[in-house]
Amino acid sequence: MSRKNRAPKREVLADPLYNSKIVTRLINRVMLDGKRGTAATIVYDAFEQIKEATGNDALEVFETAMDNIMPVLEVRARRVGGSNYQVPVEVRPERRITLGLRWLVNASRARGEHTMKERLAKEIMDAANNTGAAVKKREDTHKMAEANRAFAHFRW
């Protein structure tokens, strides 16, 4: 690991179809072994399925789903006087998106549908309806933060 300053964040380009940076980040998150074309096909096909199933704009459904998945609070381990405390802290905006996308893709991969595009589409639709594994992950994270509220004064 470099001892110099932190590596600068690179700007993500908006995807050509929806002109959205968050869709590009979703494609990057779905991508395996550098196969961006395959990942883009999966995401765009999933968005087509969402549009057919709901009749609404797929990007709006996806943004609703992301709002339902992104956490507001999380716990971080903090060592105080020889013992570790799970201290609840607010999640920075950039990290909220990162966690939301990570949980969405992981929940999609864990589903039982036949293809990844089906799994991703169903998970996004579930998340838009406030159900599904990704939303449950957020609820669990919030519950953990609420349970450890007593240690909030250890915040840094």
Curated annotation (Swiss-Prot):
PROSITE patterns per UniProt: RIBOSOMAL_S7
GO function term, MF aspect, one: tRNA binding
Q: Which UniProt keywords apply?
A: Ribonucleoprotein, Ribosomal protein, RNA-binding, rRNA-binding, tRNA-binding
Cellular component per GO, a single term: small ribosomal subunit
Question: CDD domains given for it?
Answer: uS7_Bacteria (cd14869)
One GO BP annotation here?
A: translation
Checking HAMAP family in the record gives:
Ribosomal_uS7_B
Q: What does this protein do?
A: One of the primary rRNA binding proteins, it binds directly to 16S rRNA where it nucleates assembly of the head domain of the 30S subunit. Is located at the subunit interface close to the decoding center, probably blocks exit of the E-site tRNA.
Question: What family is reported?
Answer: Belongs to the universal ribosomal protein uS7 family.
Subunit structure and binding partners: Part of the 30S ribosomal subunit. Contacts proteins S9 and S11.
Q: Which PANTHER family match?
A: RIBOSOMAL PROTEIN S7 (PTHR11205)
Task: State the name under which the record lists this protein.
Answer: Small ribosomal subunit protein uS7
